Amino acid sequence: MISIKGTGRFLLDNYRIWQRRAFNRPIQLRKGYKVLAIETSCDDTCVSVLDRFSKSAAPNVLANLKDTLDSIDEGGIIPTKAHIHHQARIGPLTERALIESNAREGIDLICVTRGPGMPGSLSGGLDFAKGLAVAWNKPLIGVHHMLGHLLIPRMGTNGKVPQFPFVSLLVSGGHTTFVLSRAIDDHEILCDTIDIAVGDSLDKCGRELGFKGTMIAREMEKFINQDINDQDFALKLEMPSPLKNSASKRNMLSFSFSAFITALRTNLTKLGKTEIQELPEREIRSIAYQVQESVFDHIINKLKHVLKSQPEKFKNVREFVCSGGVSSNQRLRTKLETELGTLNSTSFFNFYYPPMDLCSDNSIMIGWAGIEIWESLRLVSDLDICPIRQWPLNDLLSVDGWRTDQL
């Protein structure tokens, strides 16, 4: 007779065997497969469903939903409020996405942002995705957020262009990085910021000038472009050139953006312009334009220095990606193509950007990156993975939790 204690041990051992077999089971591909993608690295709760109906064509987007935390009154993102926002919105958004895509019973792969990002925000999406992976007995891929930005320009051509190797300027509110990518799992960081990101700097400068919203830099760009010639051209700001490669600062292959905020405040004080709301629009437009130009000039100058100081790395590189929230800025795109497209031996002939609606954080890029990871590397994630606050792209596969999914 088997004792209750022995029965419990027997059931537990058999459950563990089933669990190992179930979650080490490879993806059983039909002709195609469907992907549920989740992104919660900052203040956007994003859910999408992609139909990978064929490996020879770009996936169809069956659903794409986003709900952004309203942080206008706070003047910035409060991590605890972002965490609560994700907890409140991730369930309803996922339910809507599954209904819209008619995929409630047909999800084959779950892709979710693992990092980098705000730990509380990341955990909201990652914990939810792991729960679904257990409930549905489906494989999980914890995706690098910046890899999503880097790869999303490839989705429209089903990964055909840009072809590896290529370089990427990843510009957002949390990152400013120049990367050389030789393969999906081979990335070299060539230039990174030593303080804040370009999007953060532009947002804070915009806030100093009285702009409001959840995307302040974009509001400032719109204001500048309303009438680019309606400026006070006599109003000249003294703007910095951070980490300039002078005799005392050789080979400073880094970005720095905090100085622009300080410089703007100093200029406003010198000009006696402390009450922004009292300034004429043409003066505000002139100040905003000069700030934006100075920030973008800094990026261009640093990119030129990287390209000229290490020409051997770019011998066979002729494709340039610019992605991330700030990549939607048309002035930045124009400056990149004008100034980097004519650099002699390091000229880039092809420039690639995401569609405008996929420049900012979204879950489609997470789903596409997961598709590329699985189809190229045959990798999935363990169920014990945790959020990663800081995760350099060059350490993509060195973190724990990856395993091979054998067909």
Swiss-Prot record:
Gene disruption: observed consequences: Loss of QRI7 leads to the formation of mitochondria with abnormal morphology and no DNA.
Subcellular location: Mitochondrion
The enzyme's E.C. designation: 2.3.1.234
Effect annotated for changing D44A: Severely impairs t(6)A37 formation. No effect on dimer formation
GO biological process: one example: tRNA threonylcarbamoyladenosine modification
Binding annotation for a divalent metal cation: H145, H149, D361
Enzyme's top EC category: transferase
Record GO terms (molecular function): metal ion binding; N(6)-L-threonylcarbamoyladenine synthase activity; nucleotidase activity; tRNA binding
PROSITE patterns, per database record: GLYCOPROTEASE
Reaction it catalyzes: L-threonylcarbamoyladenylate + adenosine(37) in tRNA = N(6)-L-threonylcarbamoyladenosine(37) in tRNA + AMP + H(+)
SUPFAM superfamilies: Actin-like ATPase domain
Domain of life: Eukaryota
Record annotation: effect of changing H149A: Severely impairs t(6)A37 formation
Cofactor note: Binds 1 divalent metal cation per subunit.
Result when mutating V134R: Severely impairs t(6)A37 formation. Prevents dimerization
Further information: Present with 1400 molecules/cell in log phase SD medium.
NCBIfam families (alphabetical): gcp_kae1
Alphabetized HAMAP family for the sequence: TsaD
Family: Belongs to the KAE1 / TsaD family.
Chain's role: Required for the formation of a threonylcarbamoyl group on adenosine at position 37 (t(6)A37) in mitochondrial tRNAs that read codons beginning with adenine. Probably involved in the transfer of the threonylcarbamoyl moiety of threonylcarbamoyl-AMP (TC-AMP) to the N6 group of A37. Involved in mitochondrial genome maintenance.
Record protein name field: tRNA N6-adenosine threonylcarbamoyltransferase, mitochondrial
Gene name per UniProt: QRI7
